[in-house]
């Protein structure tokens, strides 16, 4: 849920009309006075807006579930769409959590196009799936929190040109693993899904194979 929230468009004012956006938070609006390279102050304000939007949706979800419960429909569900979910400033400003990725690009393509499209991770939600995977305060799908409980050997692979998961995510996950039998390897020049990079995909697979052999797991 942390990563999802980092991608959430903080400019959306009305969930029922995502065309209504706050211009000074809309990173894709040319009229936004805040343009790359972004100031630390803007990033702080924007991150707060993303969390605020997440919590606003969570409050609506909780109200909806309570409404059903009062009517005697405790198991009732309700589907909805989370609009504009690919608006992380780091897609436009590669100086944020820098690596070798190119600007104005993300792991799904041109970020503005993806943000306005019906595609994307976890766009289609039920009330309970929102609480499970999206909610900033209720979701338990949290890699950093769960990693400390891992007891088996771990290999973490990062890609140096990753256009989806930036270095802090990889490093933080590795550091969160609560034991010493862990290793962090990097695939130089690799993007998130190894698109157009079969040699990088093979390198990653061979890295996994070698580690599994070292651990006597195969």
Identify the role of each PLM range:
Residues 2-107:
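Alpha/beta-hydrolase-fold enzymes
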Residues 3-4, 83, 109, 139, ...:
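Conserved alpha/beta-hydrolase "acid-adjacent" motif
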Residues 4-10, 142-143, 152, 166-175:
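Short alpha-helix in the alpha/beta-hydrolase fold that links the catalytic acid
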Residues 128-146:
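Active-site nucleophile elbow and catalytic-triad environment of alpha/beta-hydrolase enzymes
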Residues 137, 160-165, 193-194:
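Acidic catalytic loop of the alpha/beta-hydrolase fold
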Residues 149-151, 155-158, 162:
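Short beta-strand/loop motif that positions the catalytic acidic residue
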Residues 190-203:
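Catalytic histidine-centered segment of alpha/beta-hydrolase-like enzymes
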Residues 207-218:
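C-terminal alpha-helix
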